[in-house]
UniProtKB/Swiss-Prot annotation:
Residues 41-60 have a biased composition (Polar residues). This is Uncharacterized protein C6orf15 homolog. Residues 41-65, 77-96, 147-191, 292-314 are annotated as: Disordered. The gene is STG. Pfam families: STG. It is found in: Secreted, Extracellular space, Extracellular matrix.
Length: 314
C-alpha cells in the first residue's frame, strides 16, 4: 500500500514543480530588469566622455579623446545606438547590458529626424570650420563674377594677411582672368570672322563660278592653269593632238596643218581617206571631167577599150 501511495505522489510532485518553475523564472527576470534599469540611470556615462565605472583594461588601453580634432567623430557617436544582442559596448562597464525581455528603455528611442541628414549637416559644418584660410579665400573668390574683381591698382584689405602660398595662388587666378593674346595675330581674327567658303576671293569678280584668277596659283602649276596641273606647251591644241603646229584637227597625224580627219597624205588639203601622193587629185583629168571627149558609156563589150587613160576610173 505504501508503495502504491508513494508511486502516485511522485507524478503529482513533478507536476507541481513544473507549475512552480515558470513563476520563479519570471520573478528572477523581473528583479534583474529592475536592477539593470537602475544601473543604467545612475551609471550611464555622458556622451563623448570615456566611461569611469568600468574596470581598466591593461591589454587595450583607451587613448584620451581630443575634443578639438575629433569633432567629426563625435557627430556619429551621438547618433549611434547600442547593440540589441545583449553584449556590452566596447569600453563600457560590465553592468551595462540590455534586458533579456527585449524591451528598450525610453531614453534610447530613435530621433524624429533622419540620422543621415543630421550626420551630413554636422560633417559639412565641421568641414567648413576646418578649411584653411587659403582655400576659403579661393572658394569665395571663385564665386565672384569675372568683372567684379578689384582693379589692378587697388590692393585688397586681406592681401597682406595671406601667406606666401595664398598670394601665389591669388596671382595665378588673376593671370588666368586676363584675356589671352591670339597666337595667329590679326590674320587669325580675320580668318575666324570669315566663313569657311571665304576662298571665293580667288575667283575673278563679275565672272561666272569656276573662272580662275590668273594672279593666284592653285597648286603650283602656274597662274591660271588649274589645280596642280602643268602648263600646256601649245595652248591652241586640242586633246589627243600629236601635231606640233597649232590649229590642226583632232587625231591628225600629218606633219602639216590644215589636213582633214584621218588623212595620211604628206601634203595638206587632201580629201578624207585619200591615199594619193599628191593633194587634191582624185582623177588624172581636170576636175569635173570624168572621161575624155569621144568616149562613150555605151561601148560594146566586144570592142576593146580605147588606149586613152581617161577611159578608166582612177
Amino acid at each position: 500500500m505504501r508503495g502504491r501511495v508513494a508511486g502516485s505522489c511522485a507524478p503529482l510532485g513533478l507536476l507541481l514543480v513544473c507549475l512552480r518553475l515558470p513563476g520563479l523564472f519570471a520573478r528572477s527576470i523581473g528583479a534583474v530588469e529592475e536592477k539593470v534599469s537602475q544601473n543604467l540611470g545612475t551609471n550611464l556615462p555622458q556622451l563623448g566622455q570615456p566611461s569611469l565605472t568600468g574596470p581598466p583594461n591593461s591589454e587595450h588601453p583607451q587613448p584620451a579623446l581630443d575634443l578639438r580634432s575629433n569633432d567629426l567623430a563625435r557627430a556619429p557617436l551621438k547618433l549611434s545606438v547600442p547593440p540589441s544582442d545583449g553584449f556590452p559596448p566596447a569600453g563600457g562597464s560590465a553592468v551595462q547590458r540590455w534586458p533579456l525581455s527585449g524591451r528598450l528603455p525610453a531614453m534610447y528611442s530613435w530621433p524624429p529626424e533622419d540620422p543621415w541628414l543630421m550626420m551630413a549637416a554636422a560633417a559639412a559644418d565641421r568641414l567648413g570650420e576646418a578649411l584653411p584660410e587659403e582655400l576659403s579665400y579661393l572658394s569665395s573668390a571663385a564665386a565672384l563674377a569675372p568683372g567684379s574683381g578689384p582693379l589692378p591698382g587697388e590692393s585688397s584689405p586681406d592681401a597682406t594677411d595671406l601667406s606666401p602660398e595664398a598670394s601665389h595662388l591669388h596671382q595665378d587666378s588673376e593671370s588666368r582672368r586676363l584675356p589671352r593674346s591670339n597666337p595667329l595675330g590679326p590674320g587669325g581674327k580675320i580668318l575666324s570672322q570669315r566663313p569657311p567658303w571665304s576662298l571665293i576671293y580667288r575667283v575673278l569678280p563679275d565672272h561666272p563660278w569656276g573662272t580662275l584668277n590668273p594672279s593666284v596659283s592653285w597648286g603650283g602649276g602656274g597662274p591660271g592653269t588649274g589645280w596642280g596641273t602643268r602648263p600646256m606647251p601649245h595652248p591652241g591644241g586640242i586633246w589627243g593632238i600629236n601635231n606640233q603646229p597649232p590649229g590642226t584637227s583632232w587625231g591628225n597625224i600629218n606633219r602639216y596643218p590644215g589636213g582633214s580627219w584621218g588623212n595620211i597624205n604628206r601634203y595638206p588639203g587632201g580629201s578624207w581617206g585619200n591615199i594619193h601622193l599628191y593633194p587634191g587629185i582624185n582623177n588624172p583629168f581636170p576636175p569635173g571631167v570624168l572621161r575624155p571627149p569621144g568616149s562613150s558609156w555605151n561601148t560594146p563589150a566586144g570592142f576593146p577599150n580605147p588606149p586613152s587613160p581617161g577611159l578608166q576610173w582612177g
